[in-house]
């Protein structure tokens, strides 16, 4: 990226913005390789696509890589959604059933995710407008169905008609077909630790869940 020499904004001292004339951004999809290059001092600046769970490793390598790590407040959240237009009509029916989505939300142990992935520094809420929340967002949606409750999640899944019909520990679709959720994600948007814990929570209520970066 090259700075626009005709950019109209200036700072309070009258200096034209932006301060940086040129930026060369390299795309590295693999998170481990991305962190390794940072630890080896192969970048001058990086903010995007860094997850809090990588901070300990980055801190350990700061002296070797001759860099500093600044942990600042951020507005980031992992969001999980279901394909409500799935070609499989039975899956589509289940994914469009609000009771199923409520169950999946209640099955997530957000307190554990906060402790393990965000070191207790996060705040659980639904995926609505971030703080400070605009006035048009009803506060009730912030905490809608976020309290960890496996019993209620199981009850809702029972009501949807999903049951373990063959004793393998996993629920089937109402018509008896097998169901397996496949979470496809990129570490540029969410840490693998968060995805792993969500997948485990869903498996615990009988919804077979796999994940792949």
Residue ranges and their predicted role:
Residues 2-119, 123, 128, 133-213:
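Extracytoplasmic/periplasmic ligand-capture domains
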